[in-house]
Amino acid sequence: MLSKKLTVDKIPHMIKNKRVLVRVDFNVPIKDGKVADPTRIVSTLDTINFLKENGAKSIVLMSHLGRPKGVRQEQFSLAPVVPALEDIIGQKVNFLNDCIGTEVEGEVANTKDGNILLLENLRFYLEEEGKGVINGEKVKADPTKVESFRSQLTRLGDLYVNDAFGTCHRAHSSMVGVNVDTRAAGFLLKKELDYFSKVLEDPKRPLTVILGGAKVADKIQLINNLLDLADEMIIGGGMAFTFNKVLNNTPIGASLYDEEGAKTVHGIMEKAKEKGVKIHIPSDFVCAESFAEDAKFAYKLKMKESQDGWLGLDIGDKTIRSFDEVIRRSNTLFWNGPSGVFEWKNFAKGSHAMLQAVTESTKNGTVSVCGGGDTLNLLKQVDGAKENISHVSTGGGASLELVEGKELPGIKALSDIN
């Protein structure tokens, strides 16, 4: 249960004079030796400030950057993060040139009260991920060395805080191997847990799930798990053509068709019927002569009228109105995937209309949670859209696995609330 995990706001009385080891996600883009986008650093500020305000003896930050695959490579050093981190928190940060070892332990033990330290990239060691590449060969870490690595990390803190949701689906040493008594979620991770529990554990009804994406096969676990939870489900994106062809035997021209996923469509519909979930698929589309931004296109072209060679790239006006009604009668929304090729202006209308319906519903009290890279890119196209969604997940693969019903190792490793 996500809502039963210990969060840092529950333990202010335990922080004073303690060394707090914090797993953050500073996997930020570096350009010309500087941080190009500090968003992930900024997102940890609430947790760092809370630990400072409650008298932590020291705050030891650990992270990965890039994919060095178990070998020290200076291009993946966390050193360039330090100036950006200092600007954001308004305090000097001591950067350590390693993440384990006697020198690191000595620095942490002897640091002045109130200091913040940043360890070097965890993934310079095979033992963090448990595998890597050495001299072009894939290798697995020695289990004995993994245990030693985890023990050395554990010696750096009295308390452990995890604020790296995006890595919670990985059973990496820094996520599951810090063996201290108190292991709490930071504020960034807490927000993810709070909002996903509102979708997965205690949603305000009706709960509507909006799914896009190219292939049914890629979303089958997600769909199956959400059918146990949802009241209504909207199927958009490339998946819609597979559903239409299988269920209605409609010609789809050159539109995307997922042969593997097609085998699962009837099973999905049977489960939906059994669970009482209404599934909505598009009834009209915007089609193009070819898959190109400047292709000749036609509005409101029903698929049964679609010429061979044409392909659907967005939903049509009738579908927009239908989906709009479903969204606006919902009290909880989970959105993963746009309805069309929104990157191209001629095929963005459907996705933008759905975004408008979601944001306006949110303003009226609906709880809305969005996740997935394409959905986030859509939000970036519209000024102020992100601020009008209840929660935009930073998790990527972690949020996807959570909604698929999987237990995330990084969350499982947190202490339970007593």
From Swiss-Prot:
Where does this protein hold ATP?
214, 219, 238, 312, 343, 374-375
Q: Does the keyword rRNA processing apply?
A: no
The pathway is:
Carbohydrate degradation; glycolysis; pyruvate from D-glyceraldehyde 3-phosphate: step 2/5
Transmembrane stretches, by residue range? Answer: none
**Residues that coordinate or bind ADP:** 213, 237, 342
- Note the PROSITE patterns from the entry: PGLYCERATE_KINASE
Any GO BP = gluconeogenesis
Gene3D superfamilies in the record? Phosphoglycerate kinase, N-terminal domain
Q: How does it assemble?
A: Monomer.
Mind telling me what this protein is named?
Answer: Phosphoglycerate kinase
Q: Which organism encodes this protein?
A: Euplotes crassus
